[in-house]
Amino acid sequence: MRLISYLTPDGPRAGVVEDDQVHPITTGVMNVVCGEEIVRTGECVPVAGLQILSPLRPGKLIGIGLNFRDHAAETGKPVPELPLLFAKMPTAVTGPSGPVRLPAYTDKADFEGELAVVIGREARDVSSADALEHVFGYAVMNDVSARDAQLREPQWVRAKGADTFAPWGPWITAADEVPTPQALGIRTW
């Protein structure tokens, strides 16, 4: 199952994507992530031509720095023993084709394609062995960074959390359709 949010003349709507069609549903994507049953409206609209929004607007967005061995190597840093966490503000979130607006404090923006992991069940102090049981699904995210601010400051909130610095989507793919997320490839262009 792939869940999408898109704009209609009546406002935002959510739907299930099958092939190149969207089947609108009666609730929002966040409600589905939280366990609400999907009820289709019976309509069907083509994906092509839709103004696609962020699949959902999370209240908390946590990133992991240096999360790929290759990326750590290219920066000359070792893979951290503990995850290097950073936050992106809710206002950083935008749709997959939304504009990225650079703040005045940066002259050097950069981007990295990332796998967004959507947590569907409340979790705290979860073991590695049980972590995937809490995952609702996956999406593609563009982790935009103000590299000059990132190199200048010890914390990364300003560098990575600026408005529009987290375009993602176009949809969330349910975890049961991704049996081995570690084997996924991510490509940007």
Predicted stretch roles:
Residues 1-83, 155, 176-179, 187:
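N-terminal non-catalytic cap/leader segment that marks the start of a structured domain
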